[in-house]
């Protein structure tokens, strides 16, 4: 086993630019990497790489704490969260902290506590990162073999994978415990317009939970993004947490099978590429979730979804014109279809007009008006509550549209306001990050496969055109 632990610091990949610049005593000659290649110099220095990762975690947690406190400092309780450009407080509110019926914020102290806790823990991580980057041992293999590793040691790598899976499983169960025992979470579907409640009757049926994975991603199906009750979400986290923990134990106790040893590339850069690929998938899924799902991301905090704002507009004008005497059941629109109501391809009664394309929207302010065959005409005439009118009017004017210069709303609207929905920001940012992570996955996967095949040499420097040109200066 000891033969794996090599103190060789040179990792043979050709690098660009000059090697004369020495940074922190690590120049290109000793490490095989130029200054700009950053942590690549630490590939075989497990102690220093630990420092880089812990310091990075410290930066992440510091951002979370500082941004959290910034949002608390700027928060105005009289305005909805989505009008204030907030992206962290909506997550805390969704977890049931500081909010009451209808998503109204009744206490900002839990948000303050969250920010301070993150700041304090970021200081601990920052200290640990600096310690391991500058003072701690360069390599962990000799002094702390449990924390040491060599990238090609397949058994150790799957053990580390197992530990990570167990930690992810514990994270999933933290949400379950919050929903079950520690005050509950915010349920946008609670009667009368949403409230915080404990989730007692979990959905644990595998046919339901895994049925989401087998659904089509299109239209009214919507794959896992179509989940619309908290029992399914929390039950899904029970399943996910259990699978992650059991899978983690499995990977700690077992060694990779022969087919896995043959199929995968076993190097640091290969693991980096696998991780980037996984993060890319997470980014794309998160993008779709925050854009379409108003249960995991309640509209009270994140603003309405696109389809929701569109349906809200149709509903608002149906209410107005019905009050003015229109017969909404039979009024004909300019196309010959129903002006307010029409039938979907499968026969349900739906809102007419341009919003017909969003007919499969489900939203808590609208569902009480549906019957067995779609929207119920008698309920539309008799049962519309003031809170439904208020909420749809609010959502109609806060569609998740907007440009980078923060002039929100429909581009042709002359009375545009400075409003960009957090859904727009979160969906766009996660799509862009997911894309770049995917490109990074392809890049590092290509390099890792080439290195494993033995032809990672970069460009042949002997015949590079620039060598025969006169210096720029």
Curated annotation (Swiss-Prot):
Task: Name a Pfam family for this protein.
Answer: PSII
Provide GO CC annotations from the record.
chloroplast thylakoid membrane; photosystem II
Biological process (GO) annotations held by this record are: photosynthetic electron transport in photosystem II
Q: Which residues cross the membrane?
A: 69-93, 134-155, 178-200, 255-275, 291-312, 447-471
Propeptide position ranges = 1-14
Residues with PTM N-acetylthreonine: 15
What are the entry keywords? Answer: Acetylation, Chlorophyll, Chloroplast, Chromophore, Manganese, Membrane, Metal-binding, Phosphoprotein, Photosynthesis, Photosystem II, Plastid, Thylakoid, Transmembrane, Transmembrane helix
> For this UniProt entry, which residues form the secretion signal?
none
| Membrane topology term | Multi-pass membrane protein
Cofactor descriptive note: Binds multiple chlorophylls and provides some of the ligands for the Ca-4Mn-5O cluster of the oxygen-evolving complex. It may also provide a ligand for a Cl- that is required for oxygen evolution. PSII binds additional chlorophylls, carotenoids and specific lipids.
Record flagged with keyword Transmembrane helix:
yes
Q: Which residues carry this modification: Phosphothreonine?
A: 15
Q: Does the keyword tRNA processing apply?
A: no
Q: Name one GO molecular function term.
A: chlorophyll binding
Kindly list the positions annotated as binding [CaMn4O5] cluster: 367
- Family according to the record: Belongs to the PsbB/PsbC family. PsbC subfamily.
- Alphabetical list of HAMAP family matching this protein: PSII_PsbC_CP43
Describe its partners and assembly state: PSII is composed of 1 copy each of membrane proteins PsbA, PsbB, PsbC, PsbD, PsbE, PsbF, PsbH, PsbI, PsbJ, PsbK, PsbL, PsbM, PsbT, PsbX, PsbY, PsbZ, Psb30/Ycf12, at least 3 peripheral proteins of the oxygen-evolving complex and a large number of cofactors. It forms dimeric complexes.
**Protein name, per record:** Photosystem II CP43 reaction center protein
The record lists the organism as: Manihot esculenta (Cassava)
């Amino acid at each position: 086993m000891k033969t794996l632990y090599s103190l060789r610091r040179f990792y043979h990949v050709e690098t660009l630019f000059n090697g004369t610049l020495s940074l922190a005593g690590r120049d290109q000659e000793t490490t095989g990497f130029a200054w700009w290649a950053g942590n690549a110099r630490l590939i075989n220095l497990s102690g220093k790489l630990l420092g880089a990762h812990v310091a990075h975690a410290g930066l992440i947690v510091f951002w979370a704490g500082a941004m959290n406190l910034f949002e608390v400092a700027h928060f105005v309780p009289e305005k909805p969260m989505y009008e204030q450009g907030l992206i962290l407080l909506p997550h805390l509110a969704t977890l049931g902290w500081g909010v009451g019926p209808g998503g109204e914020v009744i206490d900002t102290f839990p948000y303050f506590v969250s920010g301070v806790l993150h700041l304090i823990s970021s200081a601990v991580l920052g200290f640990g990162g600096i310690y391991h980057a500058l003072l701690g041992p360069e390599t962990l293999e000799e002094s702390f073999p449990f924390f040491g590793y060599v990238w090609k040691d397949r058994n150790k790598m799957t053990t580390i994978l197992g530990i990570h899976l167990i930690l992810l499983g514990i994270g999933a169960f933290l949400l379950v415990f919050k929903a079950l025992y520690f005050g509950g979470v915010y349920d946008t579907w609670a009667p009368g317009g949403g409230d915080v409640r404990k989730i007692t009757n979990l959905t644990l049926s595998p046919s339901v939970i895994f049925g989401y994975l087998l659904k089509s991603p299109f239209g009214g199906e919507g794959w896992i993004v179509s989940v619309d009750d908290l029992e399914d979400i929390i039950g899904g986290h029970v399943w996910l947490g259990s699978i992650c923990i059991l899978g983690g134990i499995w990977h700690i106790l077992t060694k990779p099978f022969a087919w896995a040893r043959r199929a995968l590339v076993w190097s640091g850069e290969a693991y980096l590429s696998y991780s980037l690929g996984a993060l890319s998938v997470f980014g794309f899924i998160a993008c779709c979730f925050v854009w379409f799902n108003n249960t995991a991301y309640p509209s009270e905090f994140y603003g309405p979804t696109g389809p929701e704002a569109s349906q809200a507009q149709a509903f608002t004008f149906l209410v107005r014109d019905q009050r003015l005497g229109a017969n909404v059941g039979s009024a004909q629109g300019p196309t010959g279809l129903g002006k307010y109501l029409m039938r979907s391809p499968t026969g349900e009664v739906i809102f007419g007009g341009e919003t017909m394309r969003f007919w499969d929207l489900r939203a808590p302010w609208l569902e009480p008006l549906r019957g067995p065959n779609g929207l119920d005409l008698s309920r539309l005439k008799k049962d519309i509550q003031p809170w439904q009118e208020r909420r749809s009017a609010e959502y109609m004017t806060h569609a998740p549209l907007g440009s980078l210069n923060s002039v929100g709303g429909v581009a042709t609207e002359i009375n545009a306001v400075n409003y960009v929905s957090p859904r727009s920001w979160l969906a766009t940012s996660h799509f862009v990050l997911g894309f770049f992570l995917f490109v990074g996955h392809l890049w590092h996967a290509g390099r890792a496969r080439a290195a494993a095949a033995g032809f990672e040499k970069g460009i042949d420097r002997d015949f590079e055109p620039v060598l025969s040109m006169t210096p720029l200066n």
